[in-house]
Amino acid sequence: MRKLILGAILAGTSLFALGTQAESLSPADIKIGRQYVELPTHVPVAQPGKIEVVELFWYGCPHCYQFEPSINAWAGKLPEDVSFRRVPALFGGLWNIHGQLFLTLEAMGVEPKVHTAIFDAIHKDGKKLATPEEMAEFLAGHGIDKDAFLKAYGSFNVKSQMEKAKKLAIAYQISGVPVMVVNGKYRFDLGSAGGPENTLQVADYLIEQERSAQ
């Protein structure tokens, strides 16, 4: 299993294949240990008082890219008591490089502006975005100042956020992406849920469970 996980990471692919969308889930179908698991140690959320949903992802992951339209539409309709955030998975190599790209753009407050464009650049246009200079050149085409980006990319703040992301992935016990975690308690993925839409149904179910428990 360890070799399988390592192979998937080195290949830049997810362990959780999208496959064919399984039959739509009803709330009665969703069971702990089947569609989702409870983490043995609950992880503190970033915004206490809100129900937190985290997606762990990698820009280079094809399954994350295919999941994007569904999760973007879903996240855009979340109620006020739910917070959604993305966290890059950092497994070394390009994972870390792209994770640093994401965290830099997030620190600059411009990540939503270019999130989809970065996915498209990698998966449609074949760009690697493997160096800060290549990233800066690409981002300049989207109105982001090169020098400001390069300064932020190497900043202490971004490096600190990298360490936090690494620790979070360990706490969540993830081995591939995309993965979702609700309220620091429940982890699930495309494979366990049975496809993209079912994954979001599991998220909705767990959000409602957490809301009812408040």
Swiss-Prot record:
It holds the Pfam family DSBA. Residues 18-208 form the Thioredoxin domain. It is found in: Periplasm. Disulfide bonds join 61-64. The keyword Disulfide bond applies. Keywords: Disulfide bond, Periplasm, Redox-active center, Signal. Involved in disulfide-bond formation. Acts by transferring its disulfide bond to other proteins. This is Thiol:disulfide interchange protein DsbA. It comes from Azotobacter vinelandii.
